[in-house]
Amino acid sequence: MQEAFLDGEVFFLRSNPDYTVMAPGNVRAVTCTAYYNGRDKSVAVSSGRGYTRTNLIKPDFAAPGINVLGVNVRGQFVGRSGSSVATAITAGAEALLMEWLVRRDGTPNSIQLKNLLILGTQRMDGREYPNREWGYGMLDLYQTFDVLRRL
């Protein structure tokens, strides 16, 4: 069966790990988050990498996503890993930022939220930003609020 599949004009394209950000993350208005191990500050091998095929800088930044502790339905702390964990952390950060902005300035849009979070990202020494793995750096909501406080 496998031989029949490979007969004829079937060939495999040379893959490129630097174009693994897909829809909906490859859209300008969407916040796209890479995920990393907070213990050793390394991007997960399975985290999407950018940029997009149209050269948008994606991911926008990275959030913790390896062995992140949270409470399960039984009230116990458990570790979870994956892009969904980083997405949940990012969504929580955006919700807190949105609440603050609504009380202060009105209703922000998704691009404003993303740009303000980018403004507060942490960047490691010796790396050029933005880059294909980390985007603009590591999510740091405290730093975002600190920057906004000083404006």
Predicted regions mapped to residue ranges:
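Extracellular S/T/G-rich loop segment that most often corresponds to the catalytic His/Ser-adjacent loop
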Residues: R14-A95, E99
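Secreted peptidase-domain scaffold signal
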Residues: T144-L151
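Hydrolase catalytic cores
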Residues: G65-Y129, M138, D146
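Substrate-binding/active-site groove segments that recognize
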Residues: P59, L139-D140
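Short secondary-structure boundary micro-motifs
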Residues: L6-D7, A44-S46, T52-T54, L113-N115, ...
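Short polybasic/polar patches that bind polyanions
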Residues: R132
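Hard-cation-handling environments
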Residues: M1-L6, V10-F11
